[in-house]
Regions:
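Core catalytic lobe of class I
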Residues: 1-169
Length: 169
């Protein structure tokens, strides 16, 4: 689908999807373009309450379409708003999902901040409907992985934080 996610969800049956992988906009306070002229810009500067409510709505729609034994991989990061850190846990706990595991992705940002330690990590959450859902770890990885191990491919400079394809393959 290439559509607003809430429009697309209307066309997906309940409990019909095995795996969902997403990395939503982080609400960092900018207007972004995809780098592709046929895609429109999106506003990444919602009031925090509205952003979190939208994330909960998104997560609950994913929950609806996910099969009982399915999994969701949700990539997000801790953010700083008005000088205070905001964790994705603030809205993940308000969704219907079970948080099976939190993975730490070291992506080594080259940015720096003169007033705090600059984050080099993002989080990847493994979410399920059922706490008994299991993972078969065929890639023999741990819960912390380094950006340098899995470089994203095929981005051609259009997306600086592309998700490593090897992780989901």
């Amino acid at each position: 689908y290439c559509d607003d996610c809430f429009n697309a969800f209307a066309n997906i049956n309940d409990s019909s999807v095995d795996l969902i992988i997403t990395s939503p906009p982080y609400n960092l306070g900018n207007n972004h373009h995809t780098g592709n002229k046929k895609h429109q810009a999106y506003n990444d500067n919602l009031p925090e309450k509205e952003y979190q409510e939208t994330q909960i709505k998104l997560l609950n729609e994913c929950f609806r379409v996910l099969k009982e034994d399915g999994s969701m991989i949700y990539n997000h990061k801790n953010r700083i708003k008005k000088g205070v850190q905001i964790s994705p846990y603030e809205w993940l706990f308000k969704s219907k999902f079970v948080i099976k595991q939190e993975l730490v992705w070291i992506n080594r940002s080259q940015n720096f901040d003169k007033i705090r330690f600059y984050p080099w990590t993002e989080r990847i959450y493994w979410l399920t409907k059922n706490p008994k859902t299991k993972l078969i770890n065929t890639i023999n990885k741990h819960d912390v992985f380094d950006w340098n191990e899995w470089k994203p491919v095929g981005t051609r400079g259009l997306h600086t934080r592309a998700f490593p394809e090897k992780f989901v393959a």
